C-alpha cells in the first residue's frame, strides 16, 4: 500500500517545509503533475493532528490534492475516502503522504489527459 514518493525534489521540499512550519500538523496542498510526478505545489490549508480543511473548488482536473498523516500511517480514513470519491469524479487525484514526504499513498490517480508532458 505504501510506495515511494512521486514528487519532484522541489515539490517534496515545499511540502516538508510547510508541514514543519505548521508544527507537524496536517496540511492540504494542491499539486500540478508533469511526467507522472507532482512537479510543483501550493499549500492552501493547515489543520490539526487529525484533520485539515480540504477545499473542493480550487483544484482542477489533472491536478492532485495532497495531505499528510502526521502518524505516518498512510491509510485513508472514511473522510478521506468520501472526499476521494468527489475529487476523483472531477478528475482530481488524491494523495496521502508522511511528514517527510518520503512515502505516498495514491488513493485516486489524476485524470492524465489534463497533465503536462
Mark where each language-model region is.
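Glycine-rich short-loop/terminal segments
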Residues: 1-58
Amino acid at each position: 500500500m505504501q510506495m515511494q514518493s512521486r514528487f519532484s525534489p522541489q515539490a517534496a521540499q515545499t511540502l516538508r517545509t510547510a508541514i514543519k512550519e505548521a508544527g507537524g500538523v496536517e496540511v492540504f496542498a494542491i499539486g500540478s503533475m508533469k511526467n507522472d510526478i507532482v512537479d510543483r505545489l501550493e499549500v492552501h490549508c493547515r489543520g490539526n493532528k487529525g484533520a485539515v480543511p480540504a477545499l473542493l473548488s480550487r483544484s482542477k482536473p489533472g491536478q492532485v490534492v495532497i495531505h499528510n498523516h502526521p502518524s505516518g500511517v498512510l491509510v485513508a480514513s472514511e473522510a478521506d475516502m468520501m472526499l476521494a470519491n468527489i475529487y476523483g469524479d472531477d478528475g482530481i487525484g488524491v494523495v496521502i503522504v508522511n511528514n517527510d514526504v518520503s512515502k505516498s499513498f495514491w488513493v485516486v490517480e489524476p485524470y492524465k489527459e489534463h497533465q503536462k508532458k
